[in-house]
Amino acid sequence: MSLPLRHALENVTSVDRILEDLLVRFIINCPNEDLSSVERELFHFEEASWFYTDFIKLMNPTLPSLKIKSFAQLIIKLCPLVWKWDIRVDEALQQFSKYKKSIPVRGAAIFNENLSKILLVQGTESDSWSFPRGKISKDENDIDCCIREVKEEIGFDLTDYIDDNQFIERNIQGKNYKIFLISGVSEVFNFKPQVRNEIDKIEWFDFKKISKTMYKSNIKYYLINSMMRPLSMWLRHQRQIKNEDQLKSYAEEQLKLLLGITKEEQIDPGRELLNMLHTAVQANSNNNAVSNGQVPSSQELQHLKEQSGEHNQQKDQQSSFSSQQQPSIFPSLSEPFANNKNVIPPTMPMANVFMSNPQLFATMNGQPFAPFPFMLPLTNNSNSANPIPTPVPPNFNAPPNPMAFGVPNMHNLSGPAVSQPFSLPPAPLPRDSGYSSSSPGQLLDILNSKKPDSNVQSSKKPKLKILQRGTDLNSIKQNNNDETAHSNSQALLDLLKKPTSSQKIHASKPDTSFLPNDSVSGIQDAEYEDFESSSDEEVETARDERNSLNVDIGVNVMPSEKDSRRSQKEKPRNDASKTNLNASAESNSVEWGPGKSSPSTQSKQNSSVGMQNKYRQEIHIGDSDAYEVFESSSDEEDGKKLEELEQTQDNSKLISQDILKENNFQDGEVPHRDMPTESNKSINETVGLSSTTNTVKKVPKVKILKRGETFASLANDKKAFDSSSNVSSSKDLLQMLRNPISSTVSSNQQSPKSQHLSGDEEIMMMLKRNSVSKPQNSEENASTSSINDANASELLGMLKQKEKDITAPKQPYNVDSYSQKNSAKGLLNILKKNDSTGYPRTEGGPSSEMSTSMKRNDATNNQELDKNSTELLNYLKPKPLNDGYENISNKDSSHELLNILHGNKNSSAFNNNVYATDGYSLASDNNENSSNKLLNMLQNRSSAINEPNFDVRSNGTSGSNELLSILHRK
């Protein structure tokens, strides 16, 4: 039989018995690790007290209500063994209370659907209202803790409402509170706590009312006051997205984020291509089914109708520009598939495509890759079934032609956007020459035909062309002589420089240092004849060669003198690029005279010609040689030479601007090259800049011996020339003034002492010789020589006075005391004339710098200076052949002489063409000014000046060295 069992704690009135039961249930039998610390043991004491409150007190209402403090003291008194700590219970409970405050709390702020009310709870042991919340357990995350605590306190599951990104977190009194924001909870839900004796009340509160009466009403709130501001902001944001459009966009964004779709959707090209191929295969299978006699279904017929409609639309679009299409690249491929639009033609290797039709180069806007080495010249065969059209060279300037390829149209694919096609202008090659990508002659002709001739001044000016084999340069030169034009300033510079340039006839011969003296005398005789027979047209041809952008310049031909003179025009540039880049800009600007291009452009062109002439042989240039010349003077080499020139020019401050400071002499120092052959050395250094050989690199340079020179002196001059890095520009000016006189004096009449003159003595002699009129006999020469001695001293005094006036500008300069003695003072006044002539200045050569140093005085003396300069011109010039022309340019004679000394780079001021005929000049234009008169005077000086046994050394003065020093300091 069984004994009926009664409830253990039912009708029990003894508190000790109840505590013994709870002691066995919650404390004695707990794991040892839970008794390892005071806090963990007190957690079990707390659970036992909750059990007493929740269950035993309900069964026996007469039992006393016990708090955790009194309940713990009773348990320890009943069983002291459970408390093994050396601490009092009340102190342990205080530590436990502090520990509980450090445990994080997770809860939820629950709003209704209208976001107007919030759900709050009130605890059984508290009189304040707060969010449903609870302490986080061991190894529990925030979301799970929030869901668990809310479900225990109000009985509502937040799993479908909670968002881990929307929460408010605060630290209050060292305790972390994290409240998740929940919206959309229905107010009709029956909230009921799941735990006993923990939650007393659950109510909805108006949020706006709470925010206004939080600190005024008697109702107490906990955590709400510290979180009111972020709650209000969150509600405002939630109300804004409540609108229908915003909700839709918000839902769409959330859906995209959920599906992993970004805002910028990337189209997969592989998938699109696969879909296109599937569509084409499906359409092909449908056509095969129809051709096999199978009756398609109604759906297939509808699909075919839609495709045919799309085909018609595409045909209409293509018919609008079909007339502008290029001929098919694949004529043999596209014709068999013209009737069947859905069949893709077989592929063809690219090599065969390029070999079968060379138009592929033109239609693909140039070569897509390197040309095939196995390509053969194609010839048109009219007997073939598909004749190959005329080859078209590549058009590099044409845009790409999308309609060039005759690929069959795949109508079942998605129709691409049709753009306006570009037509290619046909450029057929000659029929007798097969198309070949390796023909340098054809490529050079094509490039030369497209280059604009921007430097051509008149339509009659001949173009430079590359000579073919068998072509004589003499025939071309004779045709060009009648058509060339030349300005007066260029003719003047050519007349001054011609004796120097005429020494280059034997440039292609071996070094003359190994020749006897008789050979040297013969060479100089040929120089004199060449100077007398030179024409102005050759200077214009040289200017065309300098300004031309084409590279076919300077064909060296040995047999004739005219051909040698043509080659002489390029030799100075070759030497300038080989020896000294710094002197290149100055010597070239002096030698070649005025030009429209800037100094840097001139130097670049001269350097490019010099680089070209290094690799050129003295033979007729054919097609292949012309192609090599074209390759050797590319733009890259021009750019490199220009950079080297600019870097070298930067080393000296004014070396490209001031020709008189080339040797960098100190103030007051006189150039001291007084060796017995310094005159020849000075002249040969200037000649060396413009008369070196035009041969292949590493070939010895050619020197022309002067009369009286020895091989030993030439060797010394060569060493001195190699060691000198900067050529004296003042000696270049001396050479310009010396050449017209030295070329007219015969070798039998020249004194041997003239071979040993220094540069300063010769420039003084030149300035004195310019004031000598046309001599009639030796007596006039003697009287003129005495006058020149006085004029030289006056010239030195005037230049010294001008030097003082420059350094002290406040002191007045008086020229009246010198203005009435002789005509040489006109030249001195011109040298001091102020820069008020009206001629435009050109900053590109040494001549402009010399004119700047000569024109710095007051403009109040202009009338008297003009009178003196006119007298000087009348005194210097012989009577010309034609006195009928007048000065139309309204410029006085001082302007004209100053512009001639300046170099007169403004070519627009001179429009006359001067043709040299037997030493005399003919002026054919009415616009000729006084510079033409001076030009005629200088040209006629060869027949006008005849001074036998003239000793230059007798006219040298001690002040000439000081004159040259003053010129150097300027």
Swiss-Prot record:
Q: What happens when the gene is disrupted?
A: Increases autophagy activity through accumulation of autophagy-related proteins in nutrient-replete conditions.
The residue numbers the entry assigns to motif Nudix box are 134-155
The processes (GO biological process) annotated in the record are: deadenylation-dependent decapping of nuclear-transcribed mRNA; deadenylation-independent decapping of nuclear-transcribed mRNA; mRNA processing; nuclear-transcribed mRNA catabolic process, nonsense-mediated decay; positive regulation of transcription initiation by RNA polymerase II; stress granule assembly
Q: Where is the composition biased (Polar residues)?
A: 577-590, 677-691, 848-863
Bias (Acidic residues) ranges: 528-539, 625-637
The record lists the catalysed reaction(s) as: a 5'-end (N(7)-methyl 5'-triphosphoguanosine)-ribonucleoside in mRNA + H2O = N(7)-methyl-GDP + a 5'-end phospho-ribonucleoside in mRNA + 2 H(+)
Q: What is this protein called?
A: m7GpppN-mRNA hydrolase
Which organism's genome codes for this protein?
Saccharomyces cerevisiae (strain ATCC 204508 / S288c) (Baker's yeast)
Q: What is the lineage of its organism?
A: Eukaryota, Fungi, Dikarya, Ascomycota, Saccharomycotina
Whichever gene encodes this chain, its name is DCP2
